[in-house]
Amino acid sequence: MTVNDVTFTREVEPRLLLIHFLRDELGLTGSHWGCDTSNCGACVVWMDELPVKSCTVLAAMADGRRVLTVEGLERNGRLDPVQEGFARCHGLQCGFCTPGMMLTARWLLDHHPDPTPAQILEALSGQVCRCTGYENIVRSVQWAAQHHGGDGRGGHRSAPEEAG
């Protein structure tokens, strides 16, 4: 599988979940393992440019696929507008839900560059934030939309490099 533009080849135990592969095998701990029931959305990553809850995907199912985690959002040392929006507009408190929220927001902006607050809330409806109201999260996504948020990041990835 290719994760954040780096190709990895590993043998995995057949029941290993993608979230555990990313965190335990690759050391990519930005994605969080939350509810273990596919309800909270803290584990959202992209698989072939679609948001998926990585606690519901076997690592083996990602073979030959492209995976994007929150660590892969920044480019050339610059934060993605979604990441910057969450920081500037106080879209997080504890931060546990934030990686999944950011990846879902990035997908939304890539497909709807100027979403309404209702569209933002609908896109994020599969994710739970227990700390904040969603007002600052919506503001964060709106900020990103106004600052080159729909930059097509998902469709313009560089060629993957090889890793062990």
Where are these regions (language model features)?
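Signature of N-terminal electron-transfer/Fe-S-associated modules in redox systems
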Residues: 1-164
